[in-house]
Amino acid sequence: MPAGGAGTTAGAAGAGGSSALAPAGMRRLTPTEYWSSVSDLLGLDASTPAPVTEDVAAISGFKNVAASTLTLSAQGVQEYSDAALSLAGLVFGDATKRAALVGCTPAAASDPCVRAFLQAFGRRAWRRPLAAAEVDRYAGIVTSLAPMADVWTGLQYAVAGLLQSPWFLYRVEVGEPDPTRVHPLRFSAYEMAERLSYFFWDTTPDDALLDAAASGETLAPAGLDAQIARLLASPRARAGVARFFREYLSTDDLATMTKDATLFPRATPTLAAAMRDEIEATTADLVFTRHADLRDVLDNRQTFVNAELATLYGLSGVTGTMLVPATLPDSGPRAGLLGTAAFLALDARTDRTSPTLRGKFVREQLLCEPVSPPPANFAATFDAPGAAPAGKTLRQRLVQHMSDAACSSCHALMDPLGFAFEHFDALGAYRATEGGLTIDDTGTVDGQAFTGPRELAAALRANPAVTSCLARQMYRYATGHLETDGEAPVLADVGARAQAAGNAYVDYLRAIADSDGFRYAGGLR
């Protein structure tokens, strides 16, 4: 796909005014971006415990969207300082690790090895070359410590300093004048390297990508295409895809999910971990092994389970704690994302199902139709003690609840979709009845009738709005912002190009990375 194809959206976006695209700016690394970057820079292995750093509350599911609106608190600054000093000490306190990191053995602070290392490490850490004065500043740390410590200690503190700099802790993507004058700004060659690396790999750029930026390749159509292909071909691309789905589906929340132990004795931490791992393994299989259509995530029957999760799903013949491939029965009630225990358990209460939460997910995350929050004077009486009359299903109670004019407008958008999942309990296990009562899992979506989650999934698959919404979610993750009204032509072009290329997930990744919304900005924040 030629990178130059983005010119279509340049004209469309530009027609609406020079500020049609989102503005450029700087944003903090998310905790995951920080940890993956530090691990890559210092050569840390998976056994190294991640330091405590200030977390970010997601906006529309994505932490990198929220990170663009936040500054660091005093506590956050201290946490990053402590982390940098601790991790640098861990590496430089080990002769083997520090030798592997530095790549030469400095005899003194004045040894050329010192500056060479600081230039190379600094470029990767700050994702751009250091100016001579910046190298001087950090080399000065090594020199100043020479009378009281060896050169390795000086380098340790210099590295800790580089990792505390705003140039590392923030993604500084402020752009430069666009020579075509279609947009106010284009992202620079090094900023493009940064954007590509965090989008595809969820970490700091490698030397090959920074070298491509140094030669201007990340701004040239052929060079950009080559880097996109290289990044996607790497096994490291799985990290970026995994992070997208973990945030989009909130599967990190499974680690702290609680269920009523009396009602759901199978709700163990190991089962929750298997739910999370199923999502990661299944999406990786769809994206990288099967190169499946984007919509296959809705009705896919090929999954991965261990013994604990297989038991929950009613699958036989699976033993052990490791995930293994499994095929969900064609005649069964479960398939695709909306049949996973991760979705069904997360979007439920501790003691019962929640058609409202499940329907809200479908409405907002698959159809991109935001639901307004409850009014400020909302009183939560639905789950109050004594509020559940005997002999009524949850659906019957919610239908009665929707007769309240203050509740009906929003619940009507969510509950009818969520009723499709009532054959699955709050842990995601199938149930034939609800306490002996007949379950009604029929409904309609955009005027189309369905019975159960598989028919709902089929209706969603056939709905072009769902494909557009999935692309929009990827675009938000890639760019770190909620799309502006002026970016509608960009999103339309991304969808058209990806569908023409085959409609696979990677087709959307390529189209987004090659779009005007990823490469250009409408000014500064």
What are these regions (language model features)?
Residues 1-21, 25:
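Ser/Thr-rich, Pro/Gly/Ala-heavy low-complexity intrinsically disordered linkers and tails
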Residues 19, 29, 39-465, 471-476, ...:
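Active-site substrate-binding loop specific to GH73 endo-beta-N-acetylglucosaminidase modules
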Residues 27, 34:
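GGW-centered surface loops in extracellular recognition modules
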Residues 478-483:
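Axial heme c-ligation environment in periplasmic c-type cytochrome domains
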